[in-house]
Amino acid sequence: MQSSLPQFTFKWPKGPEAIILTGTFDDWKGTLPMVKDPSGAFEITLPVTFDSPSSKFYFKFIVDGQWLPSKDYKVNIDEGVENNFITEEDVIKQRENGSSTLVPESAGLAVSKNAPLIEPEAEKRAKKLRKFKIKRVIKTNKQTGERSIFSQEVVELPDSEDETQQVNKTGKNADGLSGTTTIIENNVGVNEEKAIKPYEENHPKVNLVKSEGYVTDGLGKTQSSESRLYELSAEDLEKEEEEEDEDKGGGKDTSTSADAEASEDQNKEPLSKSAKFEKPEEKVPVSSITSHAKETSVKPTGKVATETQTYETKQGAPTAAAKKIEAKKATRPSKPKGTKETPYKGVQKNPAKNGGFFKKLAQLLK
């Protein structure tokens, strides 16, 4: 709102660095700095009052720290002190002319309005654009396809950072928004966290939930993945021991079912009869055993079948007993499955400890 009081524009030619206007209006305290225009001249407009048409308005300029009167205005000398002054007539004259002719350098310039002389620093700061960088973590569920923002962080960028560098760093995310975004995907809807290096310290890590898989064995029993791994390791151990027994024992058998059958028949037969066939290889011709072994496979089951046929012709064993032994040796029973708590230990047994193969076979055929 413009003041109804008459206004007057005070001017100073270009040259100094800073000029302050003071006078009776501020009790000579030097509180009104003048504004420097693009040409380098100084000017300021303020309302003036006069008690009577003959009253005077006293003022003076502080030029770069020195109190100086201007030669372009009227001068009054009071006790050796020079001060400038204007009257009501000077104000009316400047208003009619539209501009003052006192200073040639500033002729034709618009008269400045009463505005804040110094722009506050707070307003300067408010005009500056503030830059922010948004960091998001987006969680995606593969089953439903739903995407949700897991976390979001807003970081204010310092003024020294170049905006183009920030655009190159962040770019555009999958959701079309600017900022650094990490997408998390999972199959079962469980929160999983991938590497979020820039700000992982500011966010708690998401605990990973493992869904334990189950497998079904040949017997229809469901086992966990951990017990299945333990079972496979036991089978590998059994295979290694079987290979060692084949290399060392030659024609010795490692089947646990045949050992159990032989032990039962051995308990039934008297010890005197079993002693007669302690070394059966001396009574059976070597040529007959060798010829039969060539026709069968190298596996232990083939050897057992060959030797059973040889004793059937030599000793005259019952046909039913021979077929029974053949069927048991040809079809290996399924091995018991071990668990994590009670692993299967039957593979560590060695039939050689309980007696020779021919000794047991002689007892069965007798």
UniProtKB/Swiss-Prot annotation:
<keyword id="KW-0832">Ubl conjugation</keyword>
<dbReference type="GO" id="GO:0005634">
    <property type="term" value="C:nucleus"/>
</dbReference>
<comment type="function">
    <text>Involved in G-protein mediated signal transduction and in the regulation of polarized cell growth in pheromone-induced cells.</text>
</comment>
<dbReference type="GO" id="GO:0005737">
    <property type="term" value="C:cytoplasm"/>
</dbReference>
<dbReference type="InterPro" id="IPR013783">
    <property type="entry name" value="Ig-like_fold"/>
</dbReference>
<dbReference type="GO" id="GO:0031588">
    <property type="term" value="C:nucleotide-activated protein kinase complex"/>
</dbReference>
<feature type="modified residue" description="Phosphothreonine">
    <location>
        <position position="216"/>
    </location>
</feature>
<keyword id="KW-0472">Membrane</keyword>
<comment type="similarity">
    <text>Belongs to the CRP1/MDG1 family.</text>
</comment>
<feature type="modified residue" description="Phosphoserine">
    <location>
        <position position="288"/>
    </location>
</feature>
<keyword id="KW-1017">Isopeptide bond</keyword>
<feature type="region of interest" description="Disordered">
    <location>
        <begin position="159"/>
        <end position="180"/>
    </location>
</feature>
<feature type="compositionally biased region" description="Basic and acidic residues">
    <location>
        <begin position="265"/>
        <end position="284"/>
    </location>
</feature>
<dbReference type="InterPro" id="IPR032640">
    <property type="entry name" value="AMPK1_CBM"/>
</dbReference>
<keyword id="KW-0597">Phosphoprotein</keyword>
<dbReference type="GO" id="GO:0007165">
    <property type="term" value="P:signal transduction"/>
</dbReference>
<keyword id="KW-1003">Cell membrane</keyword>
<feature type="modified residue" description="Phosphoserine">
    <location>
        <position position="160"/>
    </location>
</feature>
<feature type="region of interest" description="Disordered">
    <location>
        <begin position="217"/>
        <end position="366"/>
    </location>
</feature>
<dbReference type="InterPro" id="IPR014756">
    <property type="entry name" value="Ig_E-set"/>
</dbReference>
<feature type="cross-link" description="Glycyl lysine isopeptide (Lys-Gly) (interchain with G-Cter in ubiquitin)">
    <location>
        <position position="314"/>
    </location>
</feature>
<feature type="compositionally biased region" description="Acidic residues">
    <location>
        <begin position="233"/>
        <end position="247"/>
    </location>
</feature>
<dbReference type="Pfam" id="PF16561">
    <property type="entry name" value="AMPK1_CBM"/>
</dbReference>
<dbReference type="GO" id="GO:0019901">
    <property type="term" value="F:protein kinase binding"/>
</dbReference>
<protein>
    <recommendedName>
        <fullName>Signal transduction protein MDG1</fullName>
    </recommendedName>
</protein>
<dbReference type="GO" id="GO:0005886">
    <property type="term" value="C:plasma membrane"/>
</dbReference>
<dbReference type="InterPro" id="IPR050827">
    <property type="entry name" value="CRP1_MDG1_kinase"/>
</dbReference>
